[in-house]
Curated annotation (Swiss-Prot):
Gene3D superfamilies: GI Alpha 1, domain 2-like, P-loop containing nucleotide triphosphate hydrolases. Signal peptide: none annotated. It comes from Cryphonectria parasitica. This is Guanine nucleotide-binding protein subunit alpha. It holds the Pfam family G-alpha.
């Protein structure tokens, strides 16, 4: 009798091989797809990192895309000046030059959302004049006492260019623009052989409960903290320190049952603003156990340790970087290092190392 395989056995073997090959293809595809969850409290810099990824890996913004940021930039700029003028009333800080009152009325007459391709000339003139007023400058110095957009000074300093009839937003203008993220946004980038799927979720408190269980299979979590906000209060609850809120959120994510095997990359962000603030706003006023004075390195170490010490899992890796999300050169360097970490983590998760 022949010892050849029966038709049934051949079909069974072929099916097994096809299943094995499909599993292998799935593993390879999984290896080439990186799912990254961007987390952090509101205004920590998550959306800025996504914009940097576009600049670094997709060649930047087209003319049409830059055009689309004009209204956001105009609205951010006008709204920031309005916030300062309202704060001057509540803090009882007068204008140095009362002739500026005309410009104040111009600002208050503007809608919340500025529409159009050009900032009205009278609005540009009003912001330029008010920004030079000592009363406005004094109020700006006290911005930790109210809620002011981080980019206010940048836009005010550049108001002549922004208000020009032929204005076209540059990379920095776009990076510093601010729109509150609500819900979950997914952005995809191709980096080398890898496809990055980056999920950005709303940072404000009301957004958080919606998403946590949806992402237990992510490759890694990129968690951002605005360390410059150590002396500021939450937008949603002006009794809670922003840094304390970030620590609470990091604790809940780092030790969540959904993310036990997930590595975390921690960006301690806005180091430029942090460095400026330390000499004028003592950290000890907000964190009494801090003993480093206005020494930048000591303050960085203190904050780093406060976050890393929350990790309750010995096997969980936390990779840390001090960052300035608006600095494209620095973010390009940091993201290259992050890419190496993520590749290793992904190979581990796929069972390939």
């Amino acid at each position: 009798m022949g010892c050849g395989m029966s038709t049934e056995e051949k079909e069974g073997k072929a099916r097994n091989e096809e299943i094995e090959n499909q599993l292998k293809r799935d593993r390879m595809q999984q290896r080439n797809e990186i799912k990254m969850l961007l987390l952090g409290a509101g205004e920590s810099g998550k959306s800025t990192i996504l914009k940097q990824m576009k600049l670094i890996h997709e060649g930047g913004y087209s003319r049409d895309e830059r055009e689309s940021f004009k209204e956001i930039i105009f609205s951010n700029t006008v709204q920031s000046m309005r916030v300062i003028l309202e704060a001057m009333e509540s803090l009882e800080l007068p204008l140095e030059d009362q002739r500026m009152e005309y410009h104040v009325q111009t600002i208050f007459m503007q809608p919340a959302q500025i529409e159009g391709d050009v900032l009205p000339p009278e609005v540009g003139s009003a912001i330029e004049a008010l920004w030079k007023d000592r009363g406005v400058q004094e109020c700006f110095k006290r911005s930790r006492e109210y809620q002011l957009n981080d980019s206010a000074r940048y836009y005010f300093d550049n108001i002549a260019r922004i208000a020009a009839p032929d204005y076209m937003p540059n990379d920095q203008d776009v990076l510093r623009s601010r729109v509150k993220t609500t819900g979950i946004t997914e952005t995809t980038f191709i980096i080398g052989d890898l496809t990055y799927r980056m999920f950005d979720v709303g940072g404000q408190r009301s957004e958080r409960k919606k998403w946590i269980h949806c992402f237990e299979n992510v490759t890694t979590i990129l968690f951002l903290v605005a360390i410059s906000e150590y002396d500021q209060l939450l937008f949603e609850d002006e009794t809670v320190n922003r840094m304390q809120e970030a620590l609470t959120l990091f604790d809940s994510i780092c030790n969540s049952r959904w993310f036990i095997k997930t590595s975390i990359i921690l960006f301690l962000n806005k180091i430029d603003r942090f460095k400026e603030k330390l000499p004028v706003s003592p950290m000890k006023n907000y964190f009494p156990d801090y003993e480093g004075g206005d020494d930048y390195a000591a303050a960085c170490d203190y904050i780093l340790n406060r976050f890393v010490s929350l990790n309750q899992h010995e096997t969980k890796q936390i990779y840390t970087h001090f960052t300035c999300a608006t600095d494209t050169t620095q973010i390009r360097f940091v993201m290259a290092a992050v890419n190496d970490i993520i590749i290793q983590e992904n190979l581990r998760l796929c069972g390939l190392i």
